[in-house]
């Protein structure tokens, strides 16, 4: 009852609407948080691929200068495999787009991390609000002896 008084809820329908809104808001924030985490993961993976590519590029240039020598390939097989993997990862993550500068990637990662932190704070408060609203609604339903099935039958009458 205290929750209902704090929220100025006097009708059962208001309580139902409040609970539905809280659940909707929570699910929307969950989805935003998931998307932000996915973007952050992709950005970090791309940054790692760029670093690996830059470190192994001189080995590939040496391989090319040696006219794709089998001997050079045998000596530097691991580095060349890492180079190819980094290049493939960048191609896959960029999807044909131009490679952004490392400073831009760092800034994007910083912005995504800040957004994730802000969303997570909002997510926690929305989660608590949802739990409260759903618990109060469940308690009121129990006190009134109303379940979803009984309520539907009453509406059909």
Regions found by a protein language model. Name each.
Residues 1-157:
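Extended intrinsically disordered terminal tails
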């Amino acid at each position: 009852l205290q929750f209902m008084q704090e929220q100025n809820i006097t009708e059962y329908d208001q309580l139902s609407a409040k609970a539905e809104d809280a659940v909707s808001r929570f699910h929307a924030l969950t989805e935003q948080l998931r998307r932000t985490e996915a973007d952050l993961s992709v950005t970090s993976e791309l940054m790692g691929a760029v670093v690996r590519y830059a470190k192994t590029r001189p080995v590939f240039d040496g391989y090319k200068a040696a006219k794709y020598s089998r001997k050079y390939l045998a000596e530097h097989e691991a580095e060349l495999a890492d180079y190819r993997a980094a290049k493939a990862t960048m191609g896959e993550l960029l999807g044909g787009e131009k490679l952004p500068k490392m400073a831009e990637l760092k800034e994007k990662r910083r912005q995504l991390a800040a957004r994730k932190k802000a969303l997570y704070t909002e997510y926690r408060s929305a989660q608590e609000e949802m739990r409260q609203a759903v618990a109060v609604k469940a308690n009121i339903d129990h006190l009134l002896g109303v379940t979803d099935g009984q309520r539907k039958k009453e509406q059909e009458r």
